[in-house]
Amino acid sequence: MMLHAQHMPGQPGTPSLVFLHGFSGDCHEWQPVGEQFHGCSRLYIDLPGHGGSAAIPVDGFADVIRLLRATLISYNILKFWLVGYSLGGRVAMMAACQGIPGLCGLVVEGGHPGLQNEQARAERRLSDGRWAERFRHEPLTEVFHDWYQQPVFASLTAQQRQALTALRSQNNGETLAAMLEATSLAVQPDLREALNALAFPFYYLCGERDSKFRALAQEVAATCHVIRNAGHNAHRENPAGVVDSLAQILRL
């Protein structure tokens, strides 16, 4: 089994860019950024529970990474950079720490390296469980209205929140809930030590108004790029800034 994806070919001999979206996003999320790198092969993946992969069930990160590997093989992608946002960033970090073959470099935007104690994990398990129940049983417009009131999204304007709520409400609440539980921070290990031992380039992107993830970026051995005029979802709020950072990282 493989994940649904959109593949855009590039010039032979260049590493592929593999983009992983955030929770409730899909393969289109990264395209305004990725399509600026038309010289590279680009693969935009729908994670399980999302988009064209909505019907694919997983029990945890191991299943997600196995599907990711199968998808890369199916597209004959042998050398690549992983670029992931939020949930996609956490999947990318997990894959990198487990030694996914062919990985040349890692770029994470606003991805959490992991909680560091059992109390924090227990609190997150309860929180994610409550959200999952809401995704299963309530209208998605109401759930996402509240979702985007969370402190991490404080930099969004009312108009941006409204647009995101309308966009994300096109998802399937049941499959979102299942993926939220399967890949909760409560079940993700603390990756800091493993990330600090990576043998390939690791870069971290965060919006200048995203104080939580700017602080987390200092806890991992990554070169940090702060994106101006952006909060947690930097590639949506300032795509040109993220393009500039990626161009520097990839030396394009």
UniProtKB/Swiss-Prot annotation:
Gene3D superfamilies hit by this protein: alpha/beta hydrolase (3.40.50.1820)
Enzyme class name: lyase
Enzyme Commission number: 4.2.99.20
Keyword Lyase assigned: yes
Catalytic activity field: 5-enolpyruvoyl-6-hydroxy-2-succinyl-cyclohex-3-ene-1-carboxylate = (1R,6R)-6-hydroxy-2-succinyl-cyclohexa-2,4-diene-1-carboxylate + pyruvate
GO annotation, biological process: menaquinone biosynthetic process
Single annotated GO MF: 2-succinyl-6-hydroxy-2,4-cyclohexadiene-1-carboxylate synthase activity
Keywords: Lyase, Menaquinone biosynthesis
Pfam families named in the record: Abhydrolase_6
Superkingdom of the source species: Bacteria
Pathway assigned in UniProt: Quinol/quinone metabolism; 1,4-dihydroxy-2-naphthoate biosynthesis; 1,4-dihydroxy-2-naphthoate from chorismate: step 3/7; Quinol/quinone metabolism; menaquinone biosynthesis
Family membership: Belongs to the AB hydrolase superfamily. MenH family.
Subunit structure, interactors included: Monomer.
Function: Catalyzes a proton abstraction reaction that results in 2,5-elimination of pyruvate from 2-succinyl-5-enolpyruvyl-6-hydroxy-3-cyclohexene-1-carboxylate (SEPHCHC) and the formation of 2-succinyl-6-hydroxy-2,4-cyclohexadiene-1-carboxylate (SHCHC).
Protein name in UniProt: 2-succinyl-6-hydroxy-2,4-cyclohexadiene-1-carboxylate synthase
Source organism of the structure: Salmonella typhimurium (strain LT2 / SGSC1412 / ATCC 700720)
